[in-house]
Amino acid sequence: MSSGRCNVLMKARISAGWEERDAAVMVGRALFGVCLLVVMILRPTIAASQEAQSRDQSANAGEDFFKPPSNLFQMMTYYKTAPGSGSTKGSITNVTTETLNLRYDHALDLAPMWILALRSDLPLLAKNPISSGNPDGDYLHGVGDADVQAAVIHNLSQRWAVGFGARLIAPTGGDTLGSGKWQIMPIIGARYALWELNSSSYIEPIIRYDVSFAGDPTKKNISNLQFAPTFNLGLPDRWFISFYPSADIRINLGDPITGQTGRLFLPFDVRIGRRVSDNAALSFELGVPIIKDYPVYNLKTQVRLNVTY
């Protein structure tokens, strides 16, 4: 057998192995999310009085941006596939990013009806991009782009709240696991409580503008509008379901990314979860594209554990 034929067979076997591994990872994550939901469903419900049930219904374990708890620790696993550059010039392949994000929030009362909400994120990534330094698309591991955020929230009434702030994103992930750019993200939003339904239901539209301002000049400039027209519905027994809880609706105003044919990304995004105790909530989120002219992702899943104290 010639050496050329051996090399071809070896590459085919390696490629098949990677495809099998990626399929196993996707199945494993899906099973993990299903198992978490089953655990929440089967978890015994502690009997309580009507007064306690009413209090629990309005409790917040960190899922409501405009009602931040004093302290929050969040652990989130994030699985995403998106178009990336292939091994040959002009070709496109799927790039998988797996993230374990560690978040800490702290809220301060500035004055009656005024709150300062602080946030920091540390993403730990595993990603398989194809590049000159990683031509085989092996998984690379490390820290992604960390960020800090500050927002001022003003509660106008029990029904209305408004807020504004900004997030600073540092290029700690370097050129491979991050954007290579410093970014600033102004944020503005409002909250309207749906007391007609229950105390845990609300509409919460948020708008963000992500723009790069420094960093690696060879990297693509970032400039995109992000929308989250969140509708949260409180359900019995501490369950909740949110439509568009993440700012995944995007309009790209910056440099085009791999696979882009237009400026709009419109997904279907839903999160379902349960407050498993007065100070903890567990949720699962799924995002799939409807319009993918600006391909932010092909598939997104997130599992969050929020613990407040």
Language model region names:
Residues 50-215, 221-309:
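Transmembrane beta-barrel domains of Gram-negative outer membranes and organellar outer membranes
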Residues 1-58:
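Cleavable N-terminal export/targeting peptides
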